[in-house]
Amino acid sequence: MSPIPERAKLHIAMVVFQTGYAGNHVIMRYALNLGVSKLVFPLYRTIVAFSVLAPSAYFLEKKERPAMKISFLIQFFLLGLVGITLNQGFYIFGLDNTSPTFASATENVVPAVSFLMAALLGIEKVEWKRKDGIAKVVGTIVSVAGSLVITLYKGPTIYQPSLNIVNQTIKPEEAEEENKNWTLGCLCLMGHCLCWSSWIVLQSPLLKKYPARFSFVSYSCFFAVIQFFGISAYFERDLERWKIISGGELYALLYTGLVGSAMVFAIQIYVVERGGPLFVSAYLPLQTLIAAVLATLALGEHFYLGGLIGAILIMSGLYLVVMGKSWENQALCQQQQHMISSAASDFGDEEDYHNNKPRSPISQPLISS
């Protein structure tokens, strides 16, 4: 038995998830500045993720993998389309026309959208009159508010690093503003958030029918590779755009493929299965905080009062959501214990009735044999 409690594993997994994905925004922006194809790069990224996930699924889930059905294949195809192909496509076009900070900030609507979708579909139970339901709703709102504070309010500088760990060679974004379509970027990022929310929520019911997690994400990646290849082959006819021509592009590809896709997909589906879709989406605002801290430590950017206030709100919101889930589990356990006690009591009453039932005064048969 593992010395680490199950709930602690979920929290650690989501912190690792958000830390890795916070760097994904900066790495993707770097790759776009290098001039990678916005269609071919996601294809290569998904191939890298698939090449890691598929062997894991084959060797680790040989005996656990359920028999494949046509209905499963259709659902995996749709999950690959919504959760990977459209999700990454909208994201990369949105990031190309906005900025990493803005892209990270818009993703903070995912908890609210996921929560609403899960509640409407009955996947996430919300008891509005109980403290656990109120805590989950308020916690989600507070976390989103904290991430918006980090994005929209700077305030005075409270920490100024003495040196930059990373020497920035990327040209300032202001120099590229004339090439950006901000409206298109916002619309694409809205599509990205809607796809991500749908992906998180729709994984939960299918996982109950197909609980092999690595196989689950491998099939989704497989269909996404086919979809990306078809789209790229049709729209990207220049073979030069299919080449990886620099070490920077290769580094960006490996990071986004191994960390931004393979690791993120594996952790996400693990936590969706064990903690539910709300648990996954509730941690997304933490990404904005981590991105701000990484920018301060690695790029020498100032840390502002708004970042501190936002951090406090995000952590408070996460605490409320976690406590809400804990109270919900306690309520479920109490309900189960009450049902068991009631059933045992009913069984005992029936047993007493049979034991104490009046016996017939006739001790001999009416007709002798």
From Swiss-Prot:
It is a multi-pass membrane protein. Residues 348-369 are annotated as: Disordered. The chain crosses the membrane at residues 12-31, 39-59, 72-92, 103-123, 133-153, 182-202, 214-234, 252-272, 278-298, 303-323. One of its GO terms (molecular function) is transmembrane transporter activity. InterPro entries: EamA_dom (IPR000620), WAT1-related (IPR030184). One of its GO terms (cellular component) is membrane. Its main location: membrane. Keywords: Membrane, Repeat, Transmembrane, Transmembrane helix. Residues 24-150, 194-323 form the EamA domain. It is found in: Membrane. Pfam families: EamA (PF00892). Belongs to the drug/metabolite transporter (DMT) superfamily. Plant drug/metabolite exporter (P-DME) (TC 2.A.7.4) family. This is WAT1-related protein At3g53210. It comes from Arabidopsis thaliana (Mouse-ear cress).
